[in-house]
Amino acid sequence: MKTKTYERLTSLHDKYGPQEFGKLCQKFLAITFQMAGYSRIVERGVQGVDIDAAGESGEKYAIEVKTTVTKSINFEKKDVEGLQKRKQDGYQPVLAVLRLDRFSDWIFARAQEIKPGSLYIDSLRVHRLRELEAGTRPLFDEAIGNHFHRTMQEAQRYLDNFLRQKGVEVRRL
């Protein structure tokens, strides 16, 4: 990620804390997929798979989003089960991990190849979906740049409203 993106994400993390930060990043990722041209996106602020994204050319991703400031994440059994359910509908299960670090970017990993538990982030590299990462990386930076200031003021409410305006289905409690 660009240095400016890192600085903005750090500001969001400092203001809102790790749990809310994770939800904000999930919404930024949904915006990123919308910018990438995915036509059918569902973003869930409730239990279950975090994001479904389907493209015009038939690609379908069910995405479990994890954010951290450490070198590992917890990939729970419930995450695996939720992704498996979406796989039955033709979605490719993806584990998306963002470590808030100066030189980090999203890692998109083929989740069906990963066992639940505490996972060292670097261990996910062998499972990466490099094309998906490359196609979304610059758009994530752009999404942060476009929506940072309003998100600092209004957090999830602003991002939810923006996503709905763009035709994304937002599911909340």
Name each region found by the language model.
Residues M1-E43:
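Acidic-basic catalytic patches of nuclease active cores, encompassing PD-(D/E)XK
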Residues R8-Y16, E20, V42, K60, ...:
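Catalytic cores of nucleic-acid endonucleases
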Residues T32-M35, Q112-L173:
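Non-catalytic C-terminal interaction segments of nucleic acid-processing enzymes
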Residues F33, I51-A53, S57-V69:
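Conserved catalytic cores of phosphodiester-cleaving nucleases, focusing on short active-site segments
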Residues A36, A54, R86-G90:
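Alpha-helix C-cap/termination motif
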Residues Q47:
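Beta-rich catalytic cores
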